[in-house]
């Protein structure tokens, strides 16, 4: 037999209970907003440092990256009022240094804040103006940057320090496949001659042990000056006579001279590998580096034929 249960009539809440219930609802609605407001504000000059900060900070950080367009030449970037506004509420600021992003130092100097912490990656790895500024291509750089980021996030937000420390360990471990690719390339191609249009890949090339040629030409390209006729001729000769196994070119900073070198390489059967200064959208730092190393490995292998 099915017996229908009668629901007892609801009692009206007393004024005291109504106020308590309302307060509880409002408190639950406010909690997410408070949690979001408590996020540590991080501003990174370059998006690969911003990506590392996001991986270490997770849900506890709000990261803004200024240079994030892989189709833009970072050397031509000019700071805007929007850039300055992004720094107003920053608690942690990360930039490359070594004169790669001098606009950031100027902006920070113009809007000093006592509670803001600045991480200059060049200082962490002992580099200065005049050195190759493309520090993120050195396998030793990101572990150092990650440790500094985790430390400063822990100081800014002690309640979540354990999360930052754990995420730091995960990040460092996630670099092992990249390091393994570097080691494998070094074991197979150490001493192999290559060339490049610009020294973007220089530190990675050194880590692999490649013989990088035409460095004066590369510096001229990076500094937006004209390479000497002798340096241009030497570069062209290396490509035409296949004195180098691979041409590495910066696809974000193409000039008429570098485009000509790329054409000579392709016409002469020298494999070309594109590298960028800015991390592509939709990829992590690890994926970006691994993909470029895979492309280099394929080009070095093809260049032997």
Where are the predicted features?
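Extracytoplasmic metal-acquisition and chelation regions
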Residues: 2, 36-305
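Bacterial N-terminal signal peptides that target proteins for export
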Residues: 3-22
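Intrinsically disordered, low-complexity segments
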Residues: 12, 25-26, 39
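C-terminal segment of classical bacterial N-terminal signal peptides
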Residues: 25-35
